[in-house]
Amino acid sequence: MNTKFILLAFTGILLLQTGIAHAQDRKIEQAIKHRKAAFTLMATYVNRMVQTVDGHRPFDAKLMAQDARTVELVSKLPWEGFVEGSERGDTRAKDDIWFEEDQFKRYANELQAKTAMVTFAAESGDLKRFKAAVGQMRDACNTCHKAFRKD
């Protein structure tokens, strides 16, 4: 009877651990999906602004201000998706993010500051100012991508 009880208890513990591990894997998958969705949404609006800056779309200050506000808002979202363990899985994030977390956070903050500048420039209606601000935002994106994204 003791052997059956021990075996049953051991089996229960294994099943519980398997369930916990599965829940942790789901949490990691959700974190990766969260940050990918935020980056995809941000890229959609950034690309429209870049097309405008590069002369492929006419400059519409009202539309660009709307797009810039969207990017500014969304630029705050992806960072909570970089949870421990999410370096594994379907991701282009380099492991360095978790080893150089302070630098990664500085780059995230820099991006957020630059997106605010783009919003301000777009709302001003000044194309020259808008182009300069978008250029600085692109530089912030590229700096972080070079350091922390697998291509």
Residues covered by each model-derived region:
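N-terminal signal peptide c-region/cleavage motif recognized by signal peptidases
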Residues: 16-20
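Long, acidic, intrinsically disordered low-complexity segments
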Residues: 2-3, 22-24
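Sequence context surrounding c-type heme c attachment/ligation sites in exported
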Residues: 25, 29-61, 67-151
